[in-house]
């Protein structure tokens, strides 16, 4: 099993992430941001990752640091669990619909961090959650997992549906990219021989 645990402590947040890439979708989430927990649950269930995240942040100010630092720490944990990337599929993609909403996520474990985020949210907030924080979450993940990530909401009227399809598609694309390919066992998935 490919497991990792990462702890990140700053003056703004204290975060612990534990992940099993070869899990069954079990999760234990306590970030202090209920909507973030709901989205992290989508990643775990649709990625079939066993995921534990505990976060304590400066929520008396706002959710920004907690959401961003959770993305950072999750990215670090995924990178640690994958290790040298031998045998992984490297690329992953998924389309996910939810009623009127449809999102596409494509990921490459290239070692080159890059985020293309194109989600025209129809509202600025989902309950109390600022939708802009989703960009900060994924930017933190990308920079610390070392991936190229393209996120596109192709259509949607309900902001909750837009957000949920993004996180579900991300979980499924991440699962595909991190899966071990039996035909490429022990090989780095690159013509360069390294990622």
UniProtKB/Swiss-Prot annotation:
GO MF term set: imidazoleglycerol-phosphate dehydratase activity
Gene Ontology, cellular component aspect: cytoplasm
EC category: lyase
SUPFAM superfamilies, per database record: Ribosomal protein S5 domain 2-like
Keyword Endoplasmic reticulum: no
Location in or out of the cell: Cytoplasm
EC number(s) reported in the record: 4.2.1.19
Intrachain disulfide bonds: none
Catalytic activity: D-erythro-1-(imidazol-4-yl)glycerol 3-phosphate = 3-(imidazol-4-yl)-2-oxopropyl phosphate + H2O
Pathway(s) of this molecule: Amino-acid biosynthesis; L-histidine biosynthesis; L-histidine from 5-phospho-alpha-D-ribose 1-diphosphate: step 6/9
Keywords, comma-separated and alphabetical: Amino-acid biosynthesis, Cytoplasm, Histidine biosynthesis, Lyase
GO biological process: L-histidine biosynthetic process
Pfam entry (one): IGPD
Family that this chain belongs to: Belongs to the imidazoleglycerol-phosphate dehydratase family.
UniProt-recorded name of the protein: Imidazoleglycerol-phosphate dehydratase
